[in-house]
Each structure stands twice: as structure tokens, then as C-alpha cells.
């Protein structure tokens, strides 16, 4: 699974961004739960999900700031 590019995320609507943020937070919770219960977890999934979450939160913040000034 390759890391997501910002140009791909910029094409999403505001609602899709919010939905994806919620989904990633749930996936991260599930991964942490699996790790805590000693189930098999691929460590790179944490990195990929945190990276995409940071990108989405940045995008959401950029849109919020630009919308408030215009």
C-alpha cells in the first residue's frame, strides 16, 4: 500500500474528508487494540494511517482557514 498523495486528497469533498478522518481514527483504534491483545499486526499500517490522517487534517484546516478569509 503506497502513501496517499495530497493531490489525490484535494479532489475529495469536505464531507468525504470528514468521513475519511473518522474512518482512519477507527482503523487506528482497531490496530492499537489488536496490538494490545497480541494479535498479528503489520507495523507499517500505523505509519500509513497516521500519514494519511495528518494529510487529511491539514487539508481540512487549510479549507477552514481559506473559507473564513474569503
Curated annotation (Swiss-Prot):
InterPro entries: Ribosomal_protein_uL29, Ribosomal_uL29, Ribosomal_uL29_CS, Ribosomal_uL29_sf. One of its GO terms (biological process) is translation. SUPFAM superfamilies: Ribosomal protein L29 (L29p). Keywords: Ribonucleoprotein, Ribosomal protein. One of its GO terms (cellular component) is cytosolic large ribosomal subunit. Signal peptide: none annotated. One of its GO terms (molecular function) is structural constituent of ribosome. It comes from the Bacteria. The keyword Electron transport does not apply. Belongs to the universal ribosomal protein uL29 family. NCBIfam families: L29 (TIGR00012). This is Large ribosomal subunit protein uL29. It comes from Thermosynechococcus vestitus (strain NIES-2133 / IAM M-273 / BP-1).
